[in-house]
């Protein structure tokens, strides 16, 4: 299944800002945005960020919704995460024989 993920945090919870200010609970750079690499259950197809808005976007592929939730769980502690199942409209159009018509 394909999923579209949007992760949004605020400047107050921004891990980059916390690290720059020397917060004792700040994650090391290697741990920030680890989700970009995916894992055994979730393949990240595209990942992008709009840093000035503290917002990230991703298209991922996984067998189960729960696998995507687990991958993005660390982001859920600092802001809102929306995970939407998606249909592959390109594959659908091709499989229906309508591609190029």
Language-model-detected regions and their locations in the chain:
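Short S/T/G/P-rich N-terminal loop/turn motif that feeds into the first structured element of a domain
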Residues: 1-53, 63-65, 88-101
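Amphipathic, hydrophobic secondary-structure cores in small proteins
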Residues: 56-57
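An amphipathic, aromatic/His-enriched active-site/gating alpha helix that lines ligand/cofactor pockets
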Residues: 61-95
